[in-house]
């Protein structure tokens, strides 16, 4: 039975991706910090699933996770944190913790799994965001981290293509999704938000088709298409206004 490891599996898109892969016959390794939520999901998925309570900000813990599950066919890097607010007022340690989860854990898992995947084949799905396409005032470090994931994914994908390696890397860039993430950072997802179930289905189907960039929804596809047509300074103004409006709707106005 093929095996898939999914980080951020306790809720939202990660949980729904785990369900999608389980339905496709994958043994799933469910990774997150919330043990109780993972147990609940494992019970729902059945016997062919394992839970791993790991703080992905701890690189030693990430390395131990790999050592327990070296035979993975699909790696899904879905765990992510966000910090909303003005950059100057954001706590530096919280930002470092976010970057550890959003970037360092993802990068370490890719480095760990790629050698074996190149020998036996595999797929990597990195969950970024449409935030990767724009500068993000009031969400600056989060947007920047997703841009890193986006560029890293495409760069390593090209390296693998030139090596003719049997591995594909896909990067998933959804717009707003109705998940607990929005409540945690204190913003409203907005009227155009998609469900995590729909997002997961798009992500998994796109990954198995070998797509480089997966962008669900017409509006999201258009935003990616037009992101390079105008100066980033223009988009920064637009994003600031949108984020401020979401902040007010989410009840996090200060």
Question: Residues of each region from the PLM?
Answer:
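Conserved glycine-rich Rossmann-like NAD(P)H-binding loop of the short-chain dehydrogenase/reductase
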Residues: 24-40
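C-terminal helical subdomain
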Residues: 171, 188-224
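Conserved NAD(P)H cofactor-binding loop of Rossmann-fold oxidoreductase domains
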Residues: 78-83
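Conserved glycine-rich cofactor-binding loop
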Residues: 10-11
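Active-site helix of classical SDR
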Residues: 110, 145
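Substrate-binding pocket helix/loop in short-chain dehydrogenase/reductase
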Residues: 86-87, 94-99
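Residue(s) in the substrate-gating loop at a strand-loop-helix junction
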Residues: 129
